[in-house]
C-alpha cells in the first residue's frame, strides 16, 4: 500500500476495474433478488449534494444486500420531460444574465460550452453525460445497461401503453379542476417547473358574500363557521380595488375586490369583467349585511390587509381571532372621521360562537390579556393566533348561536357549511396557494380552473382503497411516515395529467396534450427490465405494441400471439416476461421526503392500478434534505455544491462517508467544510491502521490463545457487526457508520493501548468489509492489499457470532477503563504527581448485596425497604446493618437508571475484581507512571485514610500518595 492515502488515485483505479469486470450488471439467477430504485434525477442542471444523499443511501443499501448474497439490481435513468428544460433552453438562447452566471459559476459549465446549450435536446445530452460521469465518480454500483431518458421514443411507447390502460379502467377523466398554472406558458405547472414555492399547495377557501346595496364584498376564509361571529370587515385604505361583473351558473353579481384578486378571478370558472375602479375610502365606514346572520357589520381601515391574499378584504371575528381583537382594540382611540366613522368602536360587542375546553367565552381576548400582548404588531400575536386556532379546531364545538349547526365539532363543519352557503348563494369556493408560486420562466403562477383538462382520478374511492391495502402490506422506513402516507392518500384529489407545452409523450387518445412530468414517472421501474433488452438490440420501436407490454408486464395474452404480431421470437418474449417475473416487485423505493405527497404517492397509485397484487411495491424509504452551510440549495438560483465538485475536492469515499454520517433518515443534513475536513482525517486514520496491520505481516486466527483484552475485542466486534446490520436493514446510515467506524475505531485504539495485537488482522478483515458499502474504493484497495483476488464488493458481509460475545470480558475491561479514568480524574483535580496508587476492591458483603438485588428485581421493581429487609434477613450480612441502608439507597437509583445490566453481569459471572486489577496492574502503572498496589476492602494491608470503606463492586476505592 502507498504510504499516504491518495483518494483520487485509488478511486480512479477501482472505478476502472468495476467498469471492466461488469460486477454490478445483474441478470436473473438462482439467488434471492433485491430490486432497489431511487428517483431518476431531473436533468436541468448538474447533480448536487442533495442528490448525493439520496443516491448514496440507495447505493449503500445495494452494496450491503449484494454482500449479504442477494442478486441486486440497482439501475438508473434520466428524467427530462416537462417544461423546465424547455424554459432553460430559452433562457440560455436569450443569454439571460442570471442564468448564464448560475450555470457557468455554480454548475461549472465551461464558458465556451454553455452558450451552445440553446435547445432542449442539447441540454439533455450534456447533462445526461455529466450525471452519469458524476455517479461513476462517486462509485455507485449501478447497472448502466438499463439507462434511458424519458424522451426516448421507446420510453414514449411504454408511457402511451400505460395511459391507454389507465383510461380504459376509467381512471383518467376529463373536466374542470383547480391546477397550478403559468399564464405565460399557458400550461399547468408541477414541482419541477417551479422557481419559488415548490412546496405550495392549493387550498380551498370559502368566499363569504357580504352585501352592500347591489354590491358584494367577498371575504375568503378557511373557517366559514366563524362568519357567525363577524363584527366588522377590514379594508386596506392603500389598496386599489375594482368593481367587477361576476357571472357563474347564470347568476350575475357585482363584486368589489382588489386588483390582484380580480386577476385571480379571471382564471376561475366564472365569467369576470372589469367595470370600474373603486376608491378604498368609498368602501370604508359602510354598513354591510352578514349573509348568514343578517346582522349589520361595519367596514374598518386596516393596513395589514394584503391585496394579494384572498379578495383583498378580510372579515373580522375578534372573539376568536387574536389579530382581529388586537386590531379592533388598536382603533378604539383612533380618529376615523376621514372615513365618516363617528361610532365609538368600544360599542362593538364580541360574538362568541365556539365552546373550547381551555377557554371561556372570548378566547382571543383571554389569550391576548394572559400573554400580555400590547398590539397587533407584537411578536406574540402570531403565537397566540396559532394556539387559539389549534385548540378550537381540535377541541371546539359550535354554540347555540349557530342554529342548526350547534354541537358540530369545528374540525367537521367546513364542508357541511360551505355546501349550505353555496346552495343559498351566501358563499362560493375559491382556490388560493398556500404560499406564492413563481414559474421557472419568472411568471407568478395562479390557480386556474381549467376546462376540458385531463385528470388522473385519484379521488376514486376504489382506487384509494387499493393503495391503502398496498400500504398496509408494505414496510415504511421510518415507520412513523406511514401515517404521513395514509393522510396524503386520504387528502389526494384528482390531478391534471396533461399539458400543452414542454417535452414528453403525447396523450395517446388526445394528441393535443402532453403527459405531464410526474405522470410519466410512476411505473418506470418496470421499464428498467425492458431497457436491458433494448440495450442488447433485441427490440425495435415498432415491436413495442400494446400486446407486447400487456404480456411482458401484466401476463395478459400469450407469447405466441405477441410473437406473431411483433415478429419477435417467442423465446425472447418469454425471456423478457421471465426477467420481469424475477425482478418484480420493487423491493425498495428510496427517496427524499419532498416526494412523499407527489411522486411516491403516484408511484403507489399507478402500481396498484395496473399490476396484480403480488407485483405491488414491498417497501418505501424516506430521507431528509441537504443544505449548504445552512442555506437551502437550488439548481436554478444557488447556492449549490455539485456532486462532481465535491468528489473532485474531497474524494468519493470521504464525500460518501460525510453525507451519510451527518444526519439520520428524515433529519436534514447540513454540508459544512469543517465536517468534511473531519471526515477526511477519520478516513486517513483508517487507512493508516490498515497499512500498519498489513505491513506487520501478522495473521493470527481465533485459534490463537486469547487474553482478556482479546476476548473483549472479539466481543465488541460482534456487537458492532450486529448493530451495523440492524441499522442498515432500517436504512439508518448514521447509526451504521457510528457502529462500524466511530465506536469501533475507539475500541481498536483501546485494544492497542492495552497491548492487544493478536487480533488486529481479524479486526481489519471484518472492519474493512463492514465499511465497504460506505467507502467502497478504499475498502477494495485494502482488501486487495490483504491478498484477496476477488473484489470486496462481492465478499461476504460480516455476520455476528453470538458464541464470541463475552459479557464477562466486556465488564472486566469496562472496570479497568473506569478505574483508570477515576485515577486520572483525581490526579487532574488535585494536581498532584502520584508516587504510588492503592486500589481497594469491594468487600464480599457488598458483592452479595448486589447479587440479592439482582434476584429481587426479577420479581418486582426494586424498593429500598424491601431490599434492606432481604439483606438484613441474611445472617452473614446482618452484622453490616449500619452500612446496608446507605449502600442500598445508593445502588437502587443506579439500578433504575440503566446500571442493572452491569450489576447482573457482575453478579452472575462472579467477576473477581481483585484478580482482574492485579492482572492489569502493569498496564495501570505504565499509564499512571507509578507503582499500583491492589487490596481487598475485606483485608487491606495498608489503608492510612480508611479509603477502603468506599469501595463498591465495579468501583474500587482509590488512595494516592
Swiss-Prot record:
**SUPFAM superfamilies found in the cross-reference section:** Anticodon-binding domain of a subclass of class I aminoacyl-tRNA synthetases, Nucleotidylyl transferase, ValRS/IleRS/LeuRS editing domain
Compartments where located: Cytoplasm
Q: Name one GO molecular function term.
A: aminoacyl-tRNA deacylase activity
Q: Name one GO biological process term.
A: leucyl-tRNA aminoacylation
Which top-level enzyme class is recorded in the Swiss-Prot or TrEMBL entry? ligase
Read off the CDD domains from this record.
Anticodon_Ia_Leu_AEc
Residue positions binding ATP? 635
Family per record: Belongs to the class-I aminoacyl-tRNA synthetase family.
HAMAP family given in the database record: Leu_tRNA_synth_A
Q: What is this protein called?
A: Leucine--tRNA ligase
Organism whose genome encodes this protein: Methanosarcina acetivorans (strain ATCC 35395 / DSM 2834 / JCM 12185 / C2A)
Q: What is the lineage of its organism?
A: Archaea, Methanobacteriati, Methanobacteriota, Stenosarchaea group, Methanomicrobia
Amino acid at each position: 500500500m502507498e504510504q499516504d492515502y491518495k483518494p483520487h488515485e485509488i478511486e480512479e483505479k477501482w472505478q476502472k476495474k468495476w467498469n471492466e469486470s461488469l460486477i454490478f450488471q445483474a441478470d436473473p439467477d438462482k439467488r434471492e433478488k433485491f430490486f432497489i430504485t431511487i428517483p431518476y434525477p431531473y436533468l436541468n442542471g448538474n447533480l448536487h449534494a442533495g442528490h448525493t444523499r439520496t443516491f448514496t443511501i440507495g447505493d449503500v443499501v445495494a452494496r450491503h444486500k449484494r454482500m449479504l448474497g442477494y442478486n441486486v439490481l440497482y439501475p438508473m435513468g434520466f428524467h427530462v420531460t416537462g417544461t423546465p428544460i424547455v424554459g432553460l433552453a430559452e433562457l440560455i438562447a436569450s443569454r439571460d444574465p442570471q442564468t448564464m452566471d448560475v450555470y457557468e459559476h455554480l454548475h461549472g459549465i465551461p464558458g465556451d460550452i454553455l452558450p451552445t446549450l440553446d435547445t432542449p435536446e442539447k441540454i439533455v445530452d450534456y447533462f445526461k453525460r455529466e450525471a452519469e460521469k458524476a455517479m461513476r465518480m462517486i462509485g455507485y454500483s449501478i447497472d448502466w445497461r438499463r439507462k434511458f431518458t424519458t424522451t426516448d421514443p421507446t420510453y414514449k411507447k411504454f408511457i402511451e401503453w400505460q395511459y391507454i390502460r389507465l383510461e380504459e379502467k376509467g381512471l383518467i377523466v376529463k373536466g374542470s379542476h383547480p391546477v397550478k398554472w403559468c399564464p405565460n406558458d399557458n400550461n399547468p405547472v408541477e414541482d419541477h417547473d417551479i422557481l419559488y414555492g415548490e412546496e405550495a399547495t392549493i387550498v380551498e377557501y370559502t368566499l363569504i358574500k357580504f352585501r352592500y346595496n347591489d354590491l358584494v364584498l367577498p371575504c375568503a376564509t378557511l373557517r366559514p363557521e366563524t362568519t357567525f361571529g363577524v363584527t366588522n370587515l377590514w379594508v386596506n385604505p392603500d389598496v386599489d380595488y375594482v368593481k367587477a361583473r361576476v357571472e357563474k351558473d347564470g347568476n350575475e353579481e357585482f363584486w368589489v375586490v382588489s386588483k390582484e384578486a380580480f386577476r385571480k378571478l379571471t382564471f376561475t370558472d366564472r365569467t369576470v369583467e372589469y367595470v370600474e375602479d373603486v376608491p378604498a375610502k368609498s368602501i370604508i365606514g359602510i354598513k354591510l349585511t352578514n349573509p348568514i346572520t343578517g346582522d349589520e357589520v361595519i367596514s374598518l381601515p386596516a393596513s395589514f390587509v394584503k391585496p394579494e391574499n384572498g379578495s383583498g378584504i378580510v372579515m373580522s371575528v375578534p372573539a376568536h381571532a387574536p389579530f382581529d381583537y388586537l386590531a379592533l382594540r388598536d382603533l378604539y382611540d383612533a380618529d376615523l372621521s376621514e372615513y365618516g366613522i363617528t361610532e365609538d368602536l368600544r360599542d362593538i360587542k364580541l360574538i362568541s360562537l365556539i365552546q373550547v375546553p381551555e377557554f371561556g367565552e372570548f378566547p382571543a381576548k383571554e389569550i391576548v390579556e394572559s400573554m400580555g400582548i400590547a398590539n397587533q404588531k407584537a411578536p406574540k400575536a402570531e403565537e397566540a393566533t396559532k394556539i387559539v386556532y389549534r385548540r378550537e379546531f381540535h377541541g371546539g364545538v359550535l354554540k347555540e348561536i349557530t342554529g342548526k349547526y350547534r354541537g358540530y365539532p369545528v374540525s367537521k363543519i367546513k364542508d357541511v357549511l360551505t355546501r349550505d352557503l353555496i346552495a343559498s348563494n351566501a358563499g362560493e369556493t375559491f382556490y388560493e396557494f398556500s404560499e406564492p408560486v413563481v414559474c421557472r420562466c419568472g411568471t407568478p403562477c395562479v390557480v386556474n380552473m381549467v376546462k376540458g383538462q385531463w385528470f388522473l382520478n385519484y379521488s376514486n374511492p376504489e382506487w384509494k382503497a387499493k393503495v391503502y391495502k398496498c400500504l398496509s402490506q408494505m414496510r415504511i422506513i421510518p415507520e412513523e411516515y406511514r401515517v404521513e402516507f395514509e393522510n396524503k392518500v386520504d387528502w389526494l384529489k384528482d390531478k391534471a395529467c396533461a399539458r400543452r407545452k414542454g417535452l414528453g409523450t403525447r396523450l395517446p387518445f388526445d394528441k393535443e396534450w402532453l403527459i405531464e412530468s410526474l405522470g410519466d414517472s410512476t411505473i418506470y421501474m418496470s421499464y428498467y427490465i425492458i431497457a436491458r433488452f433494448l440495450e442488447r438490440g433485441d427490440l425495435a420501436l415498432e415491436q413495442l405494441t400494446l400486446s407486447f407490454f400487456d404480456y411482458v408486464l401484466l401476463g395478459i395474452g400469450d407469447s405466441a400471439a405477441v410473437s406473431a404480431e411483433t415478429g419477435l421470437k417467442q423465446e425472447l418474449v418469454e425471456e423478457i416476461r421471465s426477467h420481469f417475473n424475477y425482478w418484480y416487485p420493487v423491493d425498495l423505493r428510496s427517496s427524499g421526503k419532498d416526494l412523499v405527497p407527489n411522486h411516491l404517492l403516484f408511484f403507489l397509485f399507478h402500481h396498484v392500478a395496473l399490476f396484480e397484487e403480488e407485483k405491488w411495491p414491498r417497501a418505501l424509504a424516506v430521507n431528509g434534505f441537504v443544505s449548504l452551510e445552512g442555506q437551502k440549495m437550488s439548481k436554478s438560483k444557488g447556492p449549490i455544491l455539485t456532486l462532481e465538485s465535491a468528489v473532485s475536492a474531497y474524494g468519493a469515499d470521504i464525500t460518501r462517508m460525510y453525507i451519510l454520517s451527518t444526519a439520520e433518515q428524515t433529519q436534514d443534513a447540513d454540508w459544512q467544510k469543517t465536517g468534511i475536513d473531519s471526515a477526511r482525517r477519520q478516513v486517513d486514520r483508517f487507512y493508516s491502521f490498515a497499512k500498519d496491520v498489513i505491513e506487520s505481516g501478522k495473521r493470527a486466527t481465533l485459534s490463537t490463545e486469547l487474553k482478556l483484552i482479546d476476548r473483549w475485542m472479539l466481543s465488541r466486534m460482534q456487537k458492532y457487526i450486529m448493530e451495523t446490520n440492524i441499522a442498515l436493514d432500517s436504512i439508518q446510515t448514521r447509526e451504521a457508520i457510528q457502529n462500524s467506524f466511530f465506536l469501533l475505531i475507539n475500541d481498536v485504539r483501546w485494544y492497542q493501548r492495552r497491548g492487544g495485537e493478536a487480533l488486529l488482522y481479524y479486526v481489519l478483515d471484518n472492519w474493512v468489509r463492514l465499511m465497504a458499502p460506505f467507502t467502497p474504493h478504499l475498502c477494495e484497495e485494502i482488501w486487495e492489499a490483504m491478498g484477496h483476488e476477488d473484489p470486496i464488493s462481492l465478499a461476504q458481509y460480516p455476520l455476528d457470532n453470538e458464541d464470541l460475545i463475552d459479557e464477562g470480558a466486556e465488564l472486566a475491561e469496562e472496570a479497568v477503563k473506569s478505574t483508570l479514568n477515576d485515577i486520572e480524574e483525581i490526579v487532574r483535580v488535585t494536581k498532584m504527581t502520584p508516587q504510588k496508587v492503592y486500589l481497594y476492591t469491594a468487600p464480599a458483603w457488598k458483592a452479595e448485596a448486589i447479587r440479592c438485588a439482582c434476584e429481587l428485581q426479577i420479581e418486582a421493581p426494586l424498593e429500598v425497604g424491601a431490599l434492606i429487609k432481604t439483606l438484613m434477613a441474611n445472617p452473614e450480612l446482618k452484622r453490616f446493618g449500619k452500612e446496608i441502608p446507605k449502600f442500598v439507597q445508593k445502588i437502587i437509583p443506579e439500578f433504575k437508571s440503566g446500571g442493572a445490566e452491569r450489576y447482573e453481569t457482575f453478579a452472575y459471572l462472579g467477576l473477581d475484581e481483585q484478580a482482574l486489577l492485579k492482572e492489569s496492574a502493569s498496564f495501570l502503572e505504565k499509564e499512571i507512571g507509578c507503582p499500583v498496589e491492589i487490596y481487598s476492602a475485606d483485608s487491606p494491608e495498608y489503608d492510612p485514610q480508611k479509603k477502603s470503606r468506599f469501595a463498591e463492586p465495579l468501583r474500587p476505592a482509590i488512595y494516592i500518595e
